[in-house]
């Protein structure tokens, strides 16, 4: 037996969730553009479920910012997190190029995607098995 939706509640909910997802994606894209303006000499990756494509609507964004040299990692992370807009669920890590060889980092970043490659690391990331050929 089919039960009709109560006054289109289901379709309204689905439209609301779709609008909310689009708004989150726009917040994310704007944040990445801001990161690129602030630290153009970097490579920015997305990893985790959003990079693999198996995310759900409430999944956060996992982002790695790679730099050649990091003077004060904690200070930089705090500065970059302050730029994050409210309502954007995001986990941010900052890594140096040397960190990419660490087995734990390699495992975490496997199947990541490059959002911005200001350091020209694409071939090295591919060689390390961190990005997929797309």
Model-derived segments and spans:
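Catalytic core of pol beta-like nucleotidyltransferases
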Residues: 1-43, 52-57, 67-134
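Glycine-rich beta-strand-to-loop/alpha-helix junction loops that act as flexible
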Residues: 47-49
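Short beta-strand->loop micro-motif that forms the acidic, two-metal-ion catalytic signature
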Residues: 62-65
